[in-house]
Amino acid sequence: MGRTIENKQKIVTEIKSLLDDSEMAVVLDYKGLTIKEMSDLRSRLQTNNGICKVTKNSLMRKAIDGNSNWTDLESLLTGTNAFVLIKEDVGGAVKAIQSFQKETKKSETKGALFEGRLLSESEIKEIASLPSREVLMAKIAGALNGVATKIAISINEVPSGIARSLKQHSEKSES
């Protein structure tokens, strides 16, 4: 028994909603993966605000139709595809995909779309090498704290410098 038109429309609506919330889409060839392996991939992605969706290419085509951010995904819609839609931690999710692929040696990345642009395999790897959002925020906070500390030291140094100069001047005057 095939899917009804209402069921297909519901799936397309769900995919559109997921795409609206996503920053990046990674297309994987999932041929040869077991249900257990797909579940493992999904659980890894869940911790990084990613979702793995397996759907027909024709339904994905309908979901991206008219959405300029995702139209380039069309070129990847051949064969057996799993669509990884990533909301926030793009680097963490791509790392999760790559570690999964390294362990299973069954799945292959067909391509990815980020900010309306198709990414090459090397660009996808570069994204995975980026530090997580938390690490970047900690580095920025540390840098800002360092600047604030230097400013405070500089501000305190001005009166101290004036005081030292006056003291030296008064000592010279006394001698």
UniProtKB/Swiss-Prot annotation:
Gene3D superfamilies attached to this UniProt entry: 3.30.70.1730, 6.10.250.290
Entry keywords, A to Z: Ribonucleoprotein, Ribosomal protein, RNA-binding, rRNA-binding
GO biological process, one term: translation
CDD domains: Ribosomal_L10
Family, similarity comment: Belongs to the universal ribosomal protein uL10 family.
Subunit structure: Part of the ribosomal stalk of the 50S ribosomal subunit. The N-terminus interacts with L11 and the large rRNA to form the base of the stalk. The C-terminus forms an elongated spine to which L12 dimers bind in a sequential fashion forming a multimeric L10(L12)X complex.
Biological role stated in the UniProt entry: Forms part of the ribosomal stalk, playing a central role in the interaction of the ribosome with GTP-bound translation factors.
Protein name, per record: Large ribosomal subunit protein uL10
Organism expressing this protein natively: Prochlorococcus marinus subsp. pastoris (strain CCMP1986 / NIES-2087 / MED4)
The encoding gene: rplJ
